Amino acid sequence: LNLFYDEATVVRLLLRMRWKTPVLLITTVLVLLPGANARAQVSTDDSTFDAITRQGIDEVYNLKFEEAEKTFHQLVILRPGQPAGYFFQSMITWWRIVIDMEDTHFDDRFLEGMDFVTDMCDSILDKHPGDVTALFFKGGAIGFKGRLEFHRNDYLSAANAGRKALPIVQAASELDPRNYDILLGTGMYNYYAEVIPSEYPLLKPLLLFVPRGDRAKGLEQIAIASEKGKYASIEASYLLLQIYYYYEKDYGKALNLAFKLFKRFPDNVLFHRYCGRCEYSAGDWPAVRAVFGEIQQRVRAGQRGYNSGVEREATYYVGLSKMIQKNFDEALVDFYRCDELSRLLDTQEVSGFMVMSNLKIGQIYDLQGRRDAAVQQYKKVLAMKEYQDSHAQAEKFMNDPATY
């Protein structure tokens, strides 16, 4: 169906956004899947529309937000009564959030945009309940709103909305079961529905009323979407990267995906950071220093997304690489900077970067024969909130000086 609103209907929807109270928001990590699927379903016979969509998606992933705004505005002009253009415009706002999750001032704009897309899809589905495009964009709007709520620690609303969103995903899958892009959504559900209860026991009660997942099947489905998806292959590859890195601990596969994505989108700070993280996990210290050193250069150049939080991470890992190479004086400079940045950034609680940088400073002091200064550092670490085994390490080095 080629459905269009008249101008009056679009204006009415826009006016409603001024007063509409957002409903309970969506999804645990399970329901990131509608968002990816919505992006996947720009199915159209219009080659111009298709080409514009691909161009805009690439611009978003490469953080070319101004260019993407212009590109997706063309979608709105081409099809003002369909949700695609409005949804993708909000994806620009989403990536503005993603590259700096501590910054909340884009939240309201994003939520309002997703509400508008949901309203538009509901109006289409009221007349045509089997409209696949409307189902996917509605699922996308719900999923991305929930994803933000999950990041903002509103887990109850996320789980409740995940329950609401699941039937939308199932309906869309039944309508188009052979679409490889859909496998991203079903794969995400299958994977995370099994993983979350074991990885996050506190969230287990929130998942009692949703179907059980299948970790292996989900991973296979996401991999297929990554290889064969038309529009969702990038999202699927990024998801696979995160899964291999955080849950499967397969750092070789994660590293390959990170460099593949970064090669295609060389201005994407998240893909860049994962290259460095994976090199660290693989134990390649020269590569760690090279990747995070380049990130430091981009921070100094003021490149988009390369903010103080990124600088802190890069500085910490560069410091570690120098420490491994016994460049202790240079490593101290990096750890001092990491501590300085942490004191600026840690507004809620002490971060792992602050804890570990202070622990490393103490170890270096020991290695330099500055025992009294080292002991003072370990006392500082013990006074901080524990991160991993930081207290055990500090107590150990209090009794026995660190050695190389």
Model-derived segments and their meaning:
Residues 95-96, 144, 151, 192, ...:
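Register position in tetratricopeptide repeats
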Residues 82, 131, 179, 232-233, ...:
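Residue-level recognition of tetratricopeptide repeat
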Residues 166, 170, 210-214, 219, ...:
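TPR/TPR-like (Sel1-like) alpha-helical repeat modules
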Residues 76-77, 119, 166-167, 226-227, ...:
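Amphipathic alpha-helical segments of tetratricopeptide repeats
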Residues 42-51, 59-71, 81, 89-178, ...:
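Short coil/linker segments at helix-helix boundaries
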Residues 63, 153, 213, 248-249, ...:
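Residue-level detector of the short coil/turn that links helix A to helix B
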Residues 54, 88, 95, 137, ...:
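"A position-specific structural signal for the A-helix of alpha-solenoid helical repeats
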